[in-house]
Regions:
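N-terminal regulatory/effector-sensing and dimerization cores
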Residues: 6-115, 147-153
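Intrinsically disordered, low-complexity basic tails/linkers immediately adjacent to helix-turn-helix/homeobox/MYB/SANT
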Residues: 263, 297-301
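Flexible coil/turn residues that form the inter-helical turn or adjacent wing/linker of helix-turn-helix
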Residues: 148, 208, 257-258, 269
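Hydrophobic/basic alpha-helical segments enriched in Actinobacteria
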Residues: 47, 52, 70, 131-139, ...
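Hydrophobic recognition helices of helix-based DNA-binding modules
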Residues: 101, 162-170, 230, 254
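Basic/polar phosphate-binding segments, predominantly the helix-turn-helix DNA-binding elements
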Residues: 168-189, 197-248, 265-294
Length: 301
């Protein structure tokens, strides 16, 4: 369908990166490669399938249950190469929107009145997280509005709400560092960086037989130092986090694919459908067979 039929907030890669407005880049394809691009503050995800992003030599495979939050100026490459189509969904904020949300959060009311437009750049590290959290839910609300071809005014308000959730996510990232009990700030930052390496490695292959030892090796940390630090930073043990992420991936696969329950069971690292169904039912209150399965995706543009 021709591009002129897409809403004005849905843009093309080559004319959307000036940071002058909020835009969404989305499309379904089996093969795509975009090398060496950088954006304003942005969020990368997938509506279905998976998209590979590479940043500074690191690989992030983004599924429909994950998102990648990138700071202003991070240079990346994008690749889709699959037998079945994947739909990427990328949100590019206008320059200053997220920074203004941050300014409003950390600045005293008196200073906001005296200098309401004194907005500074917001520095943060790229962040990979589950789409079932607050930021992901705000992103899903925007994606639903875009799919429904909502009015530009409605979508603009959703961008503002999403920007506020981005700031909350950045705050949580900083609190994760603060919660670590190392004395030196540089040590806390390094521990957090290594924990993030491990989480990204696990996200890349949830079906692998992860043990504490293999998780710790991915973080280049001693096993029990890794376990203690992970619990301090994220508020849950590595085992509990892995169990939650596997169930979240299963839920999204049930909602977005035609895979059988058995295929999904194996895809997230379970070897028994009975055990998988019991764990799923305990977490969500319904068996996998009770989840509404998807209709074929409707491509609007």
């Amino acid at each position: 369908m021709a591009d002129r039929q897409a809403p004005p907030y849905v843009a093309r890669c080559e004319n959307s990166r000036g940071g002058t407005r909020n835009v969404v880049l989305t499309g379904a394809t089996s093969h795509c490669h975009v090398p060496n691009f950088s954006d304003p503050v942005s969020i990368k995800t997938a509506c279905y399938g998976e998209v590979e992003w590479r940043l500074e030599g690191r690989r992030y495979v983004i599924h429909a249950d994950t998102l990648l939050l990138l700071p202003d100026g991070d240079e990346y490459a994008l690749t889709i190469d699959s037998a079945t189509p994947s739909r990427g969904f990328n949100v590019l904020f206008r320059s200053g929107l997220v920074e203004d949300c941050w300014h409003a959060m950390i600045t005293k009311p008196e200073a906001l009145l005296d200098a309401p437009y004194d907005v500074q750049p917001l520095a943060f590290r790229r962040r990979l997280e589950s789409k079932l959290g607050p930021l992901g839910q705000a992103l899903e609300a925007l994606a639903a509005a875009v799919a429904a071809k909502a009015s530009p005014e409605c979508v603009d308000w959703l961008f503002e709400s999403l920007g506020a959730k981005v700031v909350e996510s950045v705050c949580e990232q900083r609190w994760e560092v603060v919660r670590l009990n190392a004395l030196r700030p540089a040590t806390r930052l390094e521990i957090h960086r290594r924990l993030e390496l491990a989480r990204a490695a696990i996200e890349d292959d949830l079906a692998a037989p992860w043990r504490l030892l293999t998780m710790a090796r991915a973080a280049m940390m001693a096993p029990h130092h890794f376990h203690r630090s992970f619990h301090q930073a994220y508020g849950e043990t590595p085992r509990a986090w892995l169990a939650r992420r596997r169930m979240e991936r299963a839920l999204i696969l049930l909602r977005t694919t035609k895979w059988s329950v058995t295929d999904i069971c194996f895809a997230i690292g379970y070897s028994s459908t009975t055990s998988f169904s019991a764990s799923f039912t305990t977490r969500y209150g319904t068996p996998p067979s009770g989840v509404v399965r998807p209709r074929p995706p409707v491509e609007l543009w």
